[in-house]
Amino acid sequence: MSQNSNLMREVRLFENHSEREQMENLSELFAVLNALEHLEKMFSRDHVTADEYKTECFKLIDQYKVTMRLVHGATSIEEFAKKYRLHCPAAIERIREGRPITVKDDQGNVLKHIASIVEQFITFLDSLRLNTRAVDDLYPVLDDLYNAINSTSRVPIDANVTTKVKKWHDRLSSMAATDEISDDEARQMIFDTEGAYQSFQKALNEQKH
C-alpha cells in the first residue's frame, strides 16, 4: 500500500515561489518561440496574410523581449533552444533581425517618425503654455500627435503615453469647435502631456540599452 502511495504522490517541479516563477517564465519563453516558429512556417505557406503575419510577428517579438528579461540564467536564445531541445531556426532568425521578414530595415524612417512625435508633443505643449484655449485651435494639434503615436508599431509606445493622450483627444473631440477649455483643464492637460512625453522618452532610452 505504501508503495502505491509513493507512486500516487504529486511530483513537485519547484520548491518555492521563486522557482515556480522561473518555471512559468521558461514555459512562456518556450511557448513564444514555438508560436513564432509556427507563424514563420504558416506565412511561408501562404496560410496567413502579410498584414496578419506582420502584426502577430511584432507581438511575439515583443513578448520574447519581455519574457527573456524575466528568465534567470538564459544568456542567449540559441543556448535556450539547445538546452530545451527546441528546434526553431526561423524563430531565432526573426528574433535576431528584430522585425518581420516583410519589414525592411527602415531605421531612417523610424528615426524620422520619432522626431515627428517629439515635434508634435512640443508643439501641443507650447500651444497650451501660450494660453491657447479654443478647441478649434487645440484639437488639430492634439489630433496630429494622437495620429502620430498610433500610426506605427516600430516606435516603442508605452501604454501610459497612449492613455494620457487619448484621454484629452476624446475630451476635445466631444466638445464644440467654439468651446474653450478652462485654465484648470489646461493645467491638467499640460501635466498629463508632459507625463506622456517623459514616458515616451524613457521608452526610447530603454530600447537603446
From Swiss-Prot:
TM stretches of this protein: none
Gene3D superfamilies cross-referenced by the UniProt entry: 1.20.120.1130, 1.20.1440.200
Residues covered by the VPS28 N-terminal domain: 1-105
Keyword Transport: yes
InterPro entries: ESCRT_assembly_dom, Vps28, VPS28_C, VPS28_C_sf, VPS28_N, VPS28_N_sf
Superkingdom of origin: Eukaryota
Pfam family, one: VPS28
Keyword Transport on entry: yes
Residue ranges of every copy of the VPS28 C-terminal domain listed in the record: 109-205
Compartment annotation: Endosome
GO cellular component, one term: ESCRT I complex
Keywords for this protein: Endosome, Protein transport, Transport
GO MF terms, alphabetically ordered: protein-containing complex binding
Gene Ontology process terms (BP): protein transport to vacuole involved in ubiquitin-dependent protein catabolic process via the multivesicular body sorting pathway; receptor catabolic process
Subunit description: Component of the ESCRT-I complex (endosomal sorting complex required for transport I).
Family in the record: Belongs to the VPS28 family.
Function: Component of the ESCRT-I complex, a regulator of vesicular trafficking process.
PANTHER family: VACUOLAR PROTEIN SORTING 28, ISOFORM 2 VPS28, VACUOLAR PROTEIN SORTING-ASSOCIATED PROTEIN 28 HOMOLOG
Protein name (database record): Vacuolar protein sorting-associated protein 28 homolog
Species: Caenorhabditis briggsae
